[in-house]
Design a protein with these regions (language model features):
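Membrane-embedded beta-barrel scaffold of Gram-negative outer-membrane proteins
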Residues: 27, 33-35, 68-120, 124-126
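Repeated loop/turn-to-beta-strand initiation elements of outer-membrane beta-barrel proteins
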Residues: 1-2, 31-34, 85-92, 141-144, ...
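C-terminal beta-signal and adjacent terminal beta-strands/loops
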Residues: 42, 193-204, 226-245
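Transmembrane beta-barrel strands of outer-membrane/channel proteins
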Residues: 4-8, 36-40, 92-98, 146-150, ...
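Residues that define the transmembrane beta-barrel architecture of outer-membrane proteins
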Residues: 16-18, 71-75, 98, 124-128, ...
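Residue-level signature of outer-membrane beta-barrel architecture
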Residues: 16, 26, 40, 69, ...
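Surface-exposed extracellular loop regions of Gram-negative outer-membrane beta-barrel proteins
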Residues: 1-12, 17-21, 136-152
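Gram-negative outer-membrane beta-barrel transporters
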Residues: 96-100, 120-203
Length: 245
């Protein structure tokens, strides 16, 4: 099945622009589903609202005049499979997405370690994201889900293409959920693995040491919740960051 669309918008700030989009779905049988998508996207960047966490730092904020509306091509592909295993269904889903920016507002924390600058992209900026997810009900009421994601995000900072800072190269997720036969109690646990990534470029202190490490390492976070259901309401108790990161 093919579905295509064309949308037109007018902005008093950016004028008229057209957004094309296309989706393709193919099911060779009841167990396998393929999907493809492609299209263009536009977005107005509100630099202070979207990056307000930087205002609490000691960095000076520099915002260039005439920031463009962001413009990018997006491409995606996914395959979903439903595999019968011991009388139950194992769900496996794999996805890949590629975003290629034609225009982008760059958040530059590398050119000057004491400053954060916002300016229009001059060069390439893109991201590749691949994710695979699997879910299986081992027995009645108990489901285990696992997911893993790889990310490659690159942006050009004043002529130099670099890995986007503060972006984990990979992430993993494992969730377990169990509901008692009468549906009165439910137990949930989630373990998340956050991979390492690049820090903004550091500066050298008076003693020759770097202000911070160039990269940060991976870390895990665990959360859990217990829920008690009643006829018209429910109550729960839970904890986050139980690994104390």
């Amino acid at each position: 099945m093919l579905m295509a669309g064309l949308r037109g918008d007018y902005s008093n700030e950016h004028g008229f622009f057209v957004t094309p989009r296309a989706h393709l779905k193919y099911n060779p049988n009841e167990y396998v589903h393929f999907r493809l998508s492609a299209g263009k996207g536009y977005r107005t960047n509100h630099v202070l609202a979207e990056n307000n966490y930087l205002l609490s730092s000691s960095r000076k904020v520099e915002i260039a005049k005439g920031l463009d509306m962001e413009e990018a091509w997006n491409y995606g592909a996914s395959v979903s499979t439903y595999v019968p295993v011991f009388g139950k269904t194992l769900n496996i889903n794999a996805e890949y997405y590629y975003t290629d920016f034609l225009k982008q507002v760059v958040v530059d924390m590398d050119s000057n370690p004491h400053e954060v600058a916002f300016y229009n992209l001059d060069g390439r900026s893109y991201s590749h994201v691949f994710q695979v997810e699997a879910s299986y009900p081992f027995f009645k009421g108990f489901t285990l889900t696992g997911a893993y994601r790889l990310t490659d995000a690159q942006t050009t900072y004043k002529g130099q293409r670099m890995e986007k800072p503060l972006t984990s190269k990979y992430k993993g997720l494992l969730t377990a959920s169990y509901q008692t036969p009468l549906g009165i109690w439910q137990f949930d646990a989630t373990l998340q693995l956050n991979g390492g990534g690049r820090m903004p470029s550091p500066y050298e202190l008076a003693d020759g040491q770097l202000s911070w490490e160039r990269r940060y390492g991976s870390f895990e976070q665990l959360s859990a919740q217990i829920t008690r259901y009643f006829r018209r309401w429910s109550v729960y108790i839970g904890g986050e960051n139980l690994t104390n990161f």
